[in-house]
Amino acid sequence: MSNRMWGGRFASGPAEIMEEINASIGFDKRLAPQDIRGSLAHVAMLGKTGILPQADVAAIQAGLKTVQAEIESGAFTFARSLEDIHMNVESRLREIVGPAAGRLHTARSRNDQVATDMRLWVRDTLDELDAQAADLQRALAETALKHAGTVMPGFTHLQSAQPVTFGHHLLAYVEMLARDRGRFRDARARLNECPLGAAALAGTSFPIDRHATAAALGFDRPTANSLDSVADRDFALEALSAAAIAAVHLSRFAEEIVIWTSAQFGFVKLSDRFTTGSSIMPQKRNPDAAELVRAKAGRVIGALSGLLIVMKGLPLAYSKDMQEDKEGTFDALQTLSLCLAAMAGMVRDLEPVPEMLKAAAGSGYATATDLADWLVRELGLPFRDAHHVTGRLVGVAAARGVGLEALSLAEMQAEEPRITAAVYDVLGVENSVASRTSYGGTAPANVRAQAERWLKALSETK
């Protein structure tokens, strides 16, 4: 039997495998709230423009609300034979209100309908991601404020480089998340145009009011070109791009948590709430939450790559290939949502181990740059000369197996006779971080001010 929504031209129904590959209801049913919102706005516009009689409009609106209630309660039965969410809703609407339901699709195609549904869903989800990223920022800033003066090693190449503070390290991720939130908002602003009324690809001959439906659905304006309206999914690509970048940031932080919680580092502890055990090794406490965030970033990045590949060879306007925009987009954005929530929980659960952090901060000659800076500042050496002197002193200390602060003044003066005992003031890790007072530097006073600024800003924004 042919599909009664479009089957007039067909003498028989599709093959079973055709029905299976063609159907999207298994995943696009999550668009039901957006689909019904779009239909309510569309039918209201059809009534206001006189295209439909008010009696039909009222019946359709009441029927759509009944369908919505059935879906929300779990009473609705989705049928694969009806392909997608649009036809499932319309079929049930016809059962409820009769032939008037067939008027709902006046001046509309599934092409502009699904483009509208997807924009609404992505817009809603970007708003949720923005709020979740803000919550993670808040958790990071709160922890940073508590540990503004907790010294830890800063790394390059995963080798000890210069001392920083734990709070300063966390605030780096607050800044990254701020840019992520900016990308979410930028993507939202660009997608906030309404395709409804573009119809299949060429517009419609009915005297519709696209500005009215756009306004009713919270869009800034209708899309300006009917072909573009139904032919592109760059709004989903942009959202996925923003999500992928955010996922990379979360993955990097998750990797650090995995490293920091290891026995070899011991920088931080996670409670039982965010760790798991081993089925064979009773001593294990595995940072599985962090590892899963790290892994799930790959799914988000993969969804972006997948949709780019789907779209790259499609001529205008709509092709069925574009049905493949949904699963990856749904999964990626909801995966990022899960990861943001998990990271916020872990940040609030993290317990730094100050003695381990401080001990590591002083290892690996991490104050060598402070020594070089002292030679420049106090003795007037060009920085390159100071760099060489410091390098030779590091070599002396390494040969003895001690830190720079353990070298005698005589040993230092053997490399640079003008060095005085005042040099020892810059070789402690606390003095090192306290001296980094440049804007954006790791000095505890800077970190406190930045954390407080962020907490104030986050309390004032949605």
From Swiss-Prot:
GO BP: arginine biosynthetic process via ornithine; L-arginine biosynthetic process
Statement: the UniProt record of this protein carries the keyword Cytoplasm: yes
Compartments where located: Cytoplasm
Any one cellular-component term (Gene Ontology): cytosol
Highest taxon listed in the record's lineage: Bacteria
Keywords, alphabetical: Amino-acid biosynthesis, Arginine biosynthesis, Cytoplasm, Lyase
Catalytic activity: 2-(N(omega)-L-arginino)succinate = fumarate + L-arginine
EC numbers: 4.3.2.1
Pfam families for this protein: ASL_C2, Lyase_1
Alphabetical list of HAMAP family matching this protein: Arg_succ_lyase (MF_00006)
Protein name (record): Argininosuccinate lyase
